[in-house]
Amino acid sequence: RCTTIEVENSQTKFSAAIIARNKDFDLAALKLSGKPLANLNLFSEAPFALQNVIVAGYPFGDKVSTGVKFNLGIISSLAGPLNDPTLYQIDAAVQPGNSGGPVVNETGSLVGVMRAKLDETIIRRAFGVAPENMNFAINMKTLLKFLEENKILYELDKEEIRDRKTVSETLDKATFMVNCYY
């Protein structure tokens, strides 16, 4: 368990506290000591297979560079491993450090939260090949259930049309690297 949590991005740094968590889904809600420069709206419609998505995060933390990184992909399947209905399969390239980061549609509305990628060692042993871009995000239904169960307020998308530059700028302000100190 963390004794201190800090979140930071290229513009701000805050202390944070866990206000809700779900170990089954590897989800946590953090209360920040200040107000972020931007928030993400939650997508109000059901995402669909082949929908374009953008994953934002800090792959390998600050070891590569300190800024947020973006990867493009699609929703490959509306189910996770073994037909898990709480996950989407996406093909955007992800690494350690993307977990917990936003998965948004082309207009920057949240459609999921990055969770995991297939374990390369296990898949290679089972099938003789390495998996390529078989990654999984917590879907909106699961995220909304988590928020509602924990009485966390949220805002559904107003379906604004945003260009990719605006989406990039918003994600840069709204995505944080989480640092846990013991």
Could you describe each region identified by the protein language model?
Residues 67-79, 126-129:
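Short, compositionally biased
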Residues 1-65, 83-87, 149-159:
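Conserved active-site neighborhood of the chymotrypsin/trypsin-like protease fold
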Residues 76-80, 85, 103:
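A contiguous binding-surface segment within folded domains or other stable secondary-structure elements
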Residues 16, 28-30, 50, 55, ...:
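Terminal peptide-recognition signature
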Residues 44-48, 69, 94, 98, ...:
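Soluble non-cytosolic domains of exported or imported proteins
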Residues 15-16, 37-39, 59-63, 110-182:
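C-terminal cap/linker of serine protease catalytic domains
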Residues 2, 68-70, 85, 129-135:
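Short edge beta-strand segments in beta-sheet-rich domains
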Residues 93-117:
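Catalytic nucleophile loop of clan PA
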